[in-house]
Each structure stands twice: as structure tokens, then as C-alpha cells.
């Protein structure tokens, strides 16, 4: 490939709306251009990297036994109504009517369509298992698209859907996809972690997310540096921080805390550790034809409520936060001084695991400007219902017992789900088992954000000059920079020879024959992020040398002319083998 025959659209400045590094660099490197909010053109440089990501994904999906197909981006509303997601999926689902006033959607995901395929084509257990996948453009009408391709509205995704006859089969399909994802993200050259996760709006049971580790990530990842444990913070089990409850040492005492409505202010006023205070969170659940049930959830003052965990507790599946009017009716005081003692009306109390093992703690008195100190279970309060209702924190014990938790930020680039029969039962996707009885298919779904991977990779691989691509997804692996290509026969002949040698060896190479000044030429390719650069100049050729510099190298080195091509080939192969 010669640069004069290729489109290079680099910019000196990033657009004003670009907030994170990947967005800035993808625009400046000529990879993307904005069409509308969250919608982008992918220019030739960007498309080359997309195609390389897709190629690796396809290779590993095929290796895992998945079969490629292609489903339509436009889907009829009837399928979504049948699954129940027409009502449940929020405004992110782009809905429209055709000229016949029939309802359609632009697919953000394809569970309904693929289930429709399966129920129409799969009749017997002999046809199972099967795993269909596609690489398709999706649309999700994000309320606030931002960060370039990281949170766009239109995006390219690989989605796969497995169908099995039983749970053992589903678990095996899930394992194959999980292993394939590990291979994919390893080959892409990404620093990633697979973390246990919540299934969210997709539904189902088991779930893992694959996160690229980056400071700009939107998700908090809890992991143990000394073991393999990793989990989304929302899904990580929070163990009790106190192994055994100590005997009471303090008397129950009503204490003045004027204007101290927050745990931090109470701790400072009483000159006690924040860890001795209790945060009271009031929830409500509806009862048909009767007043709501009011719940008091007790957390240590330095801990945060995990709403996903709470939502899974018996009786709290559809909780809401209590209104101030309800709080006053049940507790006799507005928020800020609430606690489980002396409530006006009966409540249900749930204590976090750590709170359940505390002694001599501080709660609100249910009276403005007062708290109660020296509170103890059994003596002052009945033993509570105990549950894990908080987010884990840094230095918490790891749930696997092999160290302590650390927290990092992650960018989700892949997700695998065990759906079970959520869609097959709703849409009557059945097969005949060995005894001739109809059974619902066990489903799994497995997604990878193709375009998001580009942004995530850049967030891990950049410097003040631009992108530093991993070899496997760089738009070009090698750039040849001849000094005076149009003026020197020796330079042109050697550059062309290197180009042909590298191309013959299967290396993705571009020769910059644009006639730009060296500074402009180098700046462009450093911005674009090509991993390897060879500079061919008359002076070096007279000495039998060509200048080589890796994109991560601080200094250039000289290579013998006759060995330069092979040296670069070896470096690329070594990088791809890591």
C-alpha cells in the first residue's frame, strides 16, 4: 500500500466535544468523523482496524464451533411483544412505523429474532446444540451519547446465541464462549479481566463481563491481586468486616447532635470513628389495598447501599425509596436522624453483615438533633435479619479467601450470559426430546462490542504523540518513511524493495510516498500509531543502514539494509505470539 493512493485525514486539533483520550485520538488520527450524536463515519484508517478486530473474533468463534449468519437490523414489533420486552425495554429502543403503520424497531440486540429462527428450524434434540453468531450494526438510543465510540448510539457488535437441550449443555456452550473470549481479548493485545456480573435487562442466570482495564472506564471492578477473583463491584460479595460480635461495653444513651444529619458529621461531633456510626436507609414496598411496608436497611457509616443486591432479597423485588411523608409517618422525624429504636409504626429491619456483628454503635434517635450511642443487638434491639446489601470496598477481604480486594476502573467490551429458558418459554421455542416430549431450549447469549474495542485499546495504549496500537489491530503494522522518495533513485528503489519483501511475507505495510517533510510524516504515523517504522535515507544507505524505531521505543536503532525486513518481521511475529 502506498500512502499517495490511500486516504489519510489526520488533524492537529481534537474537536471541542471530545472528552477522553480515545475520542480525541480517533478523530485526530482520521479514524472517525461525527455524523450525528453518537453516530460516526469510519474512515479508511479506522475501518482497517475494525476489520482486523472482526477477523480475530470470527476466527475464534469458528474455532469454538459457532456458525455465522446475518439477521436484519430492522425487526418487527411482534417479536418484541411476544418476548415481553416491547413494554420493558426503555426509550433506548428505537421504534418506528412503516408506511403501512406497522411497528418496527432498530435492533439493539437480537434475542427475539434468533429465537424465532430457532423455533422455526430446530425440531429435534438431534439438531442441538447449535450456536449462531453474527457481526452486525446495532442501534441503542442513548440519552446522552458521549466519549466517541465508547458510548455511541450506532455501533458494530458481534453477538452469538447458543441453543442446548439441557442445562449441562448450556454450561458447556457457555464455557466454550468464555474460553473463546479469553483468547480473543488476549490476541487483541488488551489488558483485561473477566468479572462476575449482574444480568441486567437481558435476563437469565449466570453472567460474566469482560473489561479492559483503564482509568477512564465507567465501571468499578473489584479484584484480588493475589488470586483470580474479579467481579463487577455491583455483583461482588461483601463479607463481614467483623468476624465476631464483641460484648457490650457502653450504656444506651441519647446524645445531642445538633445539625449533624450525616454520619460523617456525627462521627466528628462525637469524636468517634465513622465505622461506629450506622447509616439508615428507608425503603418501601407496595401492598395491594393496604398501606406500604416500610423497611429500614442498616449500613455502616462508611459503606454504600447496593441496590442490585437489595432487589434480589425476599419481599424487596420491586422496592422504592420511601417518601419524606412516609418517613415522617413511620419514624416521627424527617431524614437525618433515623434509626430502628422507638419508631411510630412497625417496620422491617435488615442489617448488613458487618452491622450485624457490631457492638456499641450509633443510630438516629428518631428525633431531630439527637442520636443514640451504645446501641447493641440483643440488649437494645432484637436480632436482625442479616443480608449482604453493600458494595465492596478496597481492602475488604476477597470472597475467595485468598487476599484483599482492590478496585480499578474497567471498560466493558464483552458480556456472556446464561439465559436459560427466558426467551424460549416466552416465544415457545421448543424441541422434541429423546422421549418425544416438547422441551424449551436452553439459551445463552454472548456479545462483543467491535467498535468499542478500538476506543478501549486506545485508552490503554497512547502517549503524548498519539496512539500505540497492539500489532494485531493496528491499521498498518509497518510504515516505510523514505527521505526524498521522489528525488533519489537509491531511496526509492530500496523503499520499494522493502515494501515488496514485507508484503510478500504477509506484513501489512504502507509506504509514505506523499513527499511530506520528515517532521510531518513522522508526526502523522506516530499519531496514527503504526507499531514499526523504517526510515530510508541516502546517508544511511551509503553506510548500509536503515533506521528502525518501534512506536514504544524511546530511541531509534540502525539495522543493516539486507537484514532490515527480516528484523521487523521477527519483531512482529514475536509481538503477535505474546
UniProtKB/Swiss-Prot annotation:
Q: Which GO terms describe its molecular function?
A: aminoacyl-tRNA deacylase activity; ATP binding; proline-tRNA ligase activity
Q: Name one GO biological process term.
A: prolyl-tRNA aminoacylation
Q: Does the keyword Nucleotide-binding apply?
A: yes
Which key words are in the record?
A: Aminoacyl-tRNA synthetase, ATP-binding, Cytoplasm, Ligase, Nucleotide-binding, Protein biosynthesis
Provide an example Pfam family for this protein: HGTP_anticodon
Q: Where in the cell is it found?
A: Cytoplasm
Q: Which SUPFAM superfamilies match?
A: Class II aaRS ABD-related, Class II aaRS and biotin synthetases, YbaK/ProRS associated domain
What residue stretch is flagged as signal peptide? none
Q: Name the source's superkingdom.
A: Bacteria
Coiled-coil region: none
Spell out the disulfide connections.
none
Q: Which reaction does it catalyse?
A: tRNA(Pro) + L-proline + ATP = L-prolyl-tRNA(Pro) + AMP + diphosphate
Q: Which CDD domains match?
A: ProRS-INS (cd04334), ProRS_anticodon_short (cd00861), ProRS_core_prok (cd00779)
> Which EC numbers characterise this protein's activity in its record?
6.1.1.15
Record's GO cellular component terms: cytosol
Matches recorded under PANTHER family:
MITOCHONDRIAL RIBOSOME PROTEIN L39/PROLYL-TRNA LIGASE FAMILY MEMBER, PROLINE--TRNA LIGASE
Q: Which family does it belong to?
A: Belongs to the class-II aminoacyl-tRNA synthetase family. ProS type 1 subfamily.
HAMAP family, alphabetically?
Answer: Pro_tRNA_synth_type1
The domain-related comment in the record is: Consists of three domains: the N-terminal catalytic domain, the editing domain and the C-terminal anticodon-binding domain.
Describe its assembly.
Answer: Homodimer.
Instruction: Provide the function of this protein.
Output: Catalyzes the attachment of proline to tRNA(Pro) in a two-step reaction: proline is first activated by ATP to form Pro-AMP and then transferred to the acceptor end of tRNA(Pro). As ProRS can inadvertently accommodate and process non-cognate amino acids such as alanine and cysteine, to avoid such errors it has two additional distinct editing activities against alanine. One activity is designated as 'pretransfer' editing and involves the tRNA(Pro)-independent hydrolysis of activated Ala-AMP.
* Name of the protein in its database record: Proline--tRNA ligase
Its gene name is proS
Amino acid at each position: 500500500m502506498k500512502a499517495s493512493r490511500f486516504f489519510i485525514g489526520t488533524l492537529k486539533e481534537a474537536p471541542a466535544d471530545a472528552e477522553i483520550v480515545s475520542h480525541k485520538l480517533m478523530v485526530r488520527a482520521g479514524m472517525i468523523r461525527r455524523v450525528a450524536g453518537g453516530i460516526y463515519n469510519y474512515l479508511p484508517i479506522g475501518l482497517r482496524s475494525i476489520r482486523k478486530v472482526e477477523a480475530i473474533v470470527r476466527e475464534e468463534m469458528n474455532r469454538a464451533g459457532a456458525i455465522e449468519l446475518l439477521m436484519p437490523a430492522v425487526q418487527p414489533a411482534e417479536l418484541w411483544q411476544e418476548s415481553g420486552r416491547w413494554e420493558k425495554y426503555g426509550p433506548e429502543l428505537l421504534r418506528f412505523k412503516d408506511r403501512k403503520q406497522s411497528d418496527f424497531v432498530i435492533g439493539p440486540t437480537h434475542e427475539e429474532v434468533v429465537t424465532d429462527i430457532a423455533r422455526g428450524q430446530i425440531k429435534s434434540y438431534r439438531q442441538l446444540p447449535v450456536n449462531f453468531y453474527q457481526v452486525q450494526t446495532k442501534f441503542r438510543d442513548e440519552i446522552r451519547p458521549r466519549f466517541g465510540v465508547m458510548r455511541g448510539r450506532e455501533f458494530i457488535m458481534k453477538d452469538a446465541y447458543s441453543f442446548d437441550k439441557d442445562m449441562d449443555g448450556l454450561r458447556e456452550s457457555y464455557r466454550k464462549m468464555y474460553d473463546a473470549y479469553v483468547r480473543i481479548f488476549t490476541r487483541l493485545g488488551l489488558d483485561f479481566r473477566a468479572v462476575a456480573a449482574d444480568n441486567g435487562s437481558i435476563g437469565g442466570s449466570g453472567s460474566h463481563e469482560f473489561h479492559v482495564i483503564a482509568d477512564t472506564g465507567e465501571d468499578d471492578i473489584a479484584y484480588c491481586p493475589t488470586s483470580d477473583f474479579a467481579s463487577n463491584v455491583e455483583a461482588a460479595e461483601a463479607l463481614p468486616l467483623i468476624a465476631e460480635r464483641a460484648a457490650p461495653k457502653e450504656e444506651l444513651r441519647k446524645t445531642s447532635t445538633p445539625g449533624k444529619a450525616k454520619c460523617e458529621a456525627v462521627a466528628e461531633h462525637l469524636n468517634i470513628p465513622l465505622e461506629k456510626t450506622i447509616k439508615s436507609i428507608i425503603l418501601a414496598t407496595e401492598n395491594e389495598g393496604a398501606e406500604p411496608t416500610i423497611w429500614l436497611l442498616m449500613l455502616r457509616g462508611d459503606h454504600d447501599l447496593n441496590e442490585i443486591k437489595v432487589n434480589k432479597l425476599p419481599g424487596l423485588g420491586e422496592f422504592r425509596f420511601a417518601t419524606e411523608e412516609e418517613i415522617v409517618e413511620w419514624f416521627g422525624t424527617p431524614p437525618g436522624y433515623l434509626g430502628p429504636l422507638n419508631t411510630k409504626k412497625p417496620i422491617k429491619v435488615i442489617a448488613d453483615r458487618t452491622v450485624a456483628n457490631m457492638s456499641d454503635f450509633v443510630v438516629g434517635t428518631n428525633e431531630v438533633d439527637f442520636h443514640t450511642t451504645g446501641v447493641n443487638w440483643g440488649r437494645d434491639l432484637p436480632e436482625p435479619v442479616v443480608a449482604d446489601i453493600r458494595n465492596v470496598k478496597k481492602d475488604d477481604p476477597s470472597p475467595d479467601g485468598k487476599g484483599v480486594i482492590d478496585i480499578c476502573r474497567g471498560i466493558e467490551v464483552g458480556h456472556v450470559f446464561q439465559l436459560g429458558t427466558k426467551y424460549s418459554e416466552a416465544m415457545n421455542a421448543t424441541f422434541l426430546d429423546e422421549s418425544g416430549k416438547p422441551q424449551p431450549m436452553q439459551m445463552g447469549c454472548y456479545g462483543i462490542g467491535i467498535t468499542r474495542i478500538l476506543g478501549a485499546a486506545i485508552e490503554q495504549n497512547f502517549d503524548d504523540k498519539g496512539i500505540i496500537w497492539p500489532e494485531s489491530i493496528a491499521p498498518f503494522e509497518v510504515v516505510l518513511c523514505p527521505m526524498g522518495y521522489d528525488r533519489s533513485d537509491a531511496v526509492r528503489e530500496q523503499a520499494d524493495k522493502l515494501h515488496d519483501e514485507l508484503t510478500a511475507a504477509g506484513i501489512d505495510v504502507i509506504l509514505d510516498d506523499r513527499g511530506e517533510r520528515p517532521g510531518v510524516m513522522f508526526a502523522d504515523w506516530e499519531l496514527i500509531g503504526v507499531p514499526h517504522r523504517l526510515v530510508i535515507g541516502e546517508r544511511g544507505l551509503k553506510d548500509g543502514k536503515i533506521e528502525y524505531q518501534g512506536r514504544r521505543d524511546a530511541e531509534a536503532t540502525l539495522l543493516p539494509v539486507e537484514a532490515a525486513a527480516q528484523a521487523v518481521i521477527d519483531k512482529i511475529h514475536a509481538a503477535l505470539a505474546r
